[in-house]
Amino acid sequence: MDKSDSLLQSSSKGLRSSIFFQGSSRILTFFLNQLTIRLTSPSAYAFSSIHFEILQSTILFLSRESVRLAMQRIPSENAIITSTSTESNKSKKLSDQLQLIKNTSLISVYIGIVISLLVSLFYFYSLPNFPYSKTCIFIYTVSSFIELLSEPYYEVLQWRQKFSKTASAEGLGTIICSLLSFAISVLGRNKAPSSLPFALGNLSEKVTIFFTLRYFAKQPFSIFLHKVGENERYIFWDSSTLRIICSHTYQVLLKHLITKGDKIMVAWYASPSAQGPYALASNYGSLLARIVFRPVEDHSHIVFAQLTHYKNKKDEKKALNLLAWILKLYSYMSLFILFGSNYSDIVLLFGAGSKWASPDSSSILSWYAMYIPFMAANGVLEAFYVSAANSSQLYDQGKCYLASAVFYFITGKFLLSWFNLGSHGLILANILNLSLRICFALRFILHNYKDFSLPRSLPRPFLLALSILLSIISSFLVKHWRESKVPFLVYFLSAPSLAILYSCFIILVDKDVRGYAKILLSKYYIK
């Protein structure tokens, strides 16, 4: 078995573990969060899911994303073992590479100190007054920095291809967070509404992740650099890795503005009454993204970077086949969403409760569901682009990010203020923005990789037509249920019935899906 097949197998094992832990933990925490939301006011939930989520993601993303992207191109532990002949050289090379990885990951910690101070100070002076708001800002800042301190352990496990370990740590942290948030919400249900339960839950999550990753990595804790000897000279970092980090920094900043642009605009332009329903829709609508799309994107970054780094035709073909396989599955998930988005009323009624189940919240959730396929496709396409592109092409991507960021904020403000579309306008602006980025990434792939076949990644025309027909049927049912012309039980049971019917047609019509299912159940082997 060659190195690329070994990488695909270890990655597929990690991906299955990641999806399992993300799925099980997210489903468990989903139900706990619904109980917590029922005890929380819309304004308190909006502060937690929008304002404080922006604070934390800004600290984490700007501090570590460019470092993570650069380190995905570093040869794995297994690659070094198989490529080094003598035992003495192997031991020395592994030891040096391990220390370089820990040194490089500490860059995230050092950058995080500065960014944490700047972002927290900005929030202290700009955030609207709310019960325990200053305390929550401090807690979210501290919890973000604790997660940054776990970066050396995370990167060591990634280098060793122990992907299931990182997935376990994140899953356990999520469960602890939900349990503590719910417990504090129950204890403080008679007090003034605040985001404090979510803040303390978030802190417990990051502490859990830190100690779990440290246990799995089995490395001593240190925030100091250690020299590494190389060719009779000593270094702290590999110069080529530093160049890649610098080349990613500009794109990371722009990508963060684009990715969190909707929440930034909701936080600063939308009314407090509109922030709660949008935060809830974002929570529900991105559940599938957090369970499936995020683990797939994270592992795709690693696999694509390793398979395209050495410009080997055989490995490149495996990467392209894997990309086509993922896009194919995403396309069918998107067609499920096409008719499944009409059942948002059921999700709100059984999830957040009747006080959240307004027509406006249901409409926002349906629109957000239509946005998810664009988010999924863009994630895996950009993962391939970032992994395969050279420095000049990464600079071109930065220009694309800048153009799409300007386009997004202008379009969002235009739809939000001039057309008074509110949250619907922001979702539409997001879809238009991601469409531009998808076209940019596809252009790069089609131009540089002639073996990639886009039609192979698309659903069969018959299945697309069937999804549209099922969408019309589900729209008819929800309309007549709201008018009390159809019993709730009929409307409720139609959801799983249509999903099962559509699944059967996919298996019958598309023979590729049957082959992909076998791959998913056994192991990744890309012919």
Curated annotation (Swiss-Prot):
Q: Which cellular component, as a GO term, is one annotated location?
A: endoplasmic reticulum membrane
UniProt membrane topology term: Multi-pass membrane protein
Q: Where are the transmembrane segments?
A: 42-62, 106-126, 137-157, 167-187, 319-339, 364-384, 402-422, 426-446, 461-481, 488-508
Stated family? Belongs to the RFT1 family.
Q: Which PANTHER family match?
A: ENDOPLASMIC RETICULUM MULTISPAN TRANSMEMBRANE PROTEIN-RELATED (PTHR13117), PROTEIN RFT1 HOMOLOG (PTHR13117:SF5)
Q: Which Pfam families match?
A: Rft-1
Q: In which pathway does it act?
A: Protein modification; protein glycosylation
User: Know the name of this protein?
Assistant: Man(5)GlcNAc(2)-PP-dolichol translocation protein RFT1
The molecular function terms of the Gene Ontology recorded here are: glycolipid floppase activity
Question: What function does the entry list?
Answer: Intramembrane glycolipid transporter that operates in the biosynthetic pathway of dolichol-linked oligosaccharides, the glycan precursors employed in protein asparagine (N)-glycosylation. The sequential addition of sugars to dolichol pyrophosphate produces dolichol-linked oligosaccharides containing fourteen sugars, including two GlcNAcs, nine mannoses and three glucoses. Once assembled, the oligosaccharide is transferred from the lipid to nascent proteins by oligosaccharyltransferases.
Principal cellular location given in the protein's record: endoplasmic reticulum
Q: Which GO terms describe its biological process?
A: dolichol-linked oligosaccharide biosynthetic process; glycolipid translocation; protein N-linked glycosylation
| Protein location | Endoplasmic reticulum membrane
Q: Which UniProt keywords apply?
A: Endoplasmic reticulum, Membrane, Sugar transport, Transmembrane, Transmembrane helix, Transport
